[in-house]
């Protein structure tokens, strides 16, 4: 390949279904030697589409590996034949040692067998002719249970080695690199699952703990990574496949964008809110305009958001304390809809990390709650026991138990569950409440927080959902319903480290009342 001309390189691109890159490679006069010398940054500048970037980098890497110790063929067709032969051999090895043949669970980033299941972007992966070759090419990209971080560029590695807090531009570089790496493992799909986002962010923070700023770094990096994927998907948002995916997951629900008249009405309403609530100075007015502009961006500057939210905390607390309507407050400070910002505001008010506390509660008390006398025959508990029979993975079982614990809390304490969580019904209460869909399916489960009968935010898991529910009551100074007081007393007792509650287990209750299980 080192001796290839520009024409030979272009011929090779066509053979690899990358014909769209030919014109650009001809313009830049990329010969074989130049092709092998390309680094990640050069590929990003040379190739527009992220899927093509990932495939091209992978092909170059594969070629270098296959030609080590061998003389590079001068004919590109011979080189392609060598690569295809190696790929076929890899695929046969993969088939014989595939975990699926031994009943093992597939890792979260293992490429799906059905590559046309609606999540693959057809514009990125065109002319897919041979699924086996794609699986063979991705053999080197199969993940173990724990995600392995990619090799970062030199300047990023220097910054990480010095443990310096990255600035905004450096954060974007890290996120761009992680997103490109994820796209390779996902075979060009631009729709990672929640678990895949969690795997990547957890690996980043475990390798570089200093990036976990104030204990909230997980949400910060995960949000930034999601925003990056949204940004990459933007050029294809009019594609039929993307539109179907959006409809499937409830995006816009078929509504059109706001008209100019509606936008103008909102602007007038904001002016009225400012005049009625408090005396706004020019600096605060600038913050509010910045929030509203930043909120609609795909890639957000979360460090600047944190800074400005801290600067406006005092006036925001005054407005909430003076009973300014919550809808008006959320128009002025739209980032309060984000769970991460709610958690941060809660921490500023109470000096307590509510997410960590909530996770600890669900992990520590799930066994006691699920075996308590009051919920042993609850339909949720029965469904949980049935679902658990189909899984052996410890992480999956733990997640399912924590989810059931979250849903059953009001039943354990004799409170009204309809004020806490709604399943398969329309939200009727005005106080904060959770809406849950498919709770025991990690891939498609959905938790939404509602406030005043309108969806405030959608979250990914039961820990974030429960933490957001508790935080909403405190951040917005909403009085807890009397029929939910015992449940919140339990949660707040543990969140604020007051004392440990006691649960009568099923076995203890049986001893007290001589309870007998019905024979089955």
From Swiss-Prot:
For this protein, the record's InterPro entries field holds: SAM (IPR001660), SAM/pointed_sf (IPR013761), SAMD3 (IPR042812), SAMD3_SAM (IPR042813)
Q: Which gene encodes it?
A: SAMD3
Q: Where is this region: Disordered?
A: 85-114
Pfam families given in the database record: SAM_1
Q: Where is the SAM domain?
A: 4-71
Full protein name: Sterile alpha motif domain-containing protein 3
Which Gene3D superfamilies does UniProt cross-reference here? Transcription Factor, Ets-1 (1.10.150.50)
């Amino acid at each position: 390949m080192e001796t290839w001309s520009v024409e030979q390189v272009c011929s090779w691109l066509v053979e690899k279904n990358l014909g769209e890159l030919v014109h650009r490679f001809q313009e830049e006069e990329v010969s074989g030697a130049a092709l092998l010398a390309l680094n990640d940054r050069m590929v990003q500048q040379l190739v527009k589409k992220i899927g093509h970037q990932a495939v091209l980098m992978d092909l170059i890497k594969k070629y270098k590996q296959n030609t080590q110790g061998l003389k590079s063929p001068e004919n590109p067709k011979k080189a392609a034949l060598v690569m295809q032969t190696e790929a076929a051999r890899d695929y046969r090895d993969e088939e014989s040692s595939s975990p699926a043949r031994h009943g093992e669970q597939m890792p979260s980033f293992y490429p799906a067998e059905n590559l046309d299941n609606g999540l693959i972007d057809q514009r990125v992966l065109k002319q897919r002719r041979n699924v086996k070759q794609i699986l063979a090419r991705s053999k080197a990209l199969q993940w173990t249970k724990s995600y392995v971080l990619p090799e970062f560029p030199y300047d990023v590695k220097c910054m990480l080695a010095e443990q310096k807090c990255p600035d905004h531009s450096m954060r974007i570089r890290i996120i761009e690199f992680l997103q490109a790496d994820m796209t390779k493992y996902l075979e060009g799909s631009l729709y990672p699952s929640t678990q895949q986002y969690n795997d990547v962010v957890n690996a980043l923070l475990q390798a570089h703990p200093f990036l976990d700023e104030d204990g909230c770094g997980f949400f910060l990096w995960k949000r930034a990574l999601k925003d990056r994927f949204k940004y990459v998907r933007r050029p294809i948002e009019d594609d039929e496949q993307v539109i179907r995916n959006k409809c499937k997951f409830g995006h816009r629900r078929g509504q059109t964008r706001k008209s100019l008249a509606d936008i103008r009405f909102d602007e007038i309403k904001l002016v009225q809110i400012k005049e009625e609530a408090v005396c706004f100075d020019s600096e605060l007015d600038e913050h509010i305009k910045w929030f509203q502009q930043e909120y609609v961006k795909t890639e957000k500057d979360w460090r600047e958001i944190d800074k400005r939210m801290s600067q406006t905390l005092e006036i925001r607390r005054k407005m909430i304390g003076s009973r300014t309507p919550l809808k008006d407050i959320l128009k002025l400070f739209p980032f309060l809809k984000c769970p991460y910002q709610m958690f941060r505001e809660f921490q500023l008010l109470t000096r307590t990390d509510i997410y960590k506390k909530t996770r600890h509660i669900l992990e520590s008390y799930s066994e006691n709650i699920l075996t308590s006398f009051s919920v042993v025959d609850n339909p949720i508990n029965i469904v949980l026991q049935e679902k658990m029979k189909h899984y052996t993975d410890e992480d999956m079982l733990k997640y399912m138990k924590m989810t059931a614990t979250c849903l059953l809390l009001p039943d354990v304490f004799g409170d009204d569950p309809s004020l806490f969580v709604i399943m398969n019904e329309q939200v009727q209460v005005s106080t904060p409440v959770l809406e849950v869909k498919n709770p025991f399916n990690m891939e498609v489960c959905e938790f939404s927080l509602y406030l005043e009968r309108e969806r405030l935010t959608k979250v990914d898991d039961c820990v974030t959902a429960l933490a957001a529910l508790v935080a909403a009551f405190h951040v917005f100074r909403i009085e807890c319903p009397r029929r939910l007081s015992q449940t919140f007393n339990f949660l707040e007792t543990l969140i604020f480290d007051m004392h440990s509650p006691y649960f009568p287990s099923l076995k203890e209750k049986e001893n007290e009342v001589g309870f007998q299980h019905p024979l089955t």
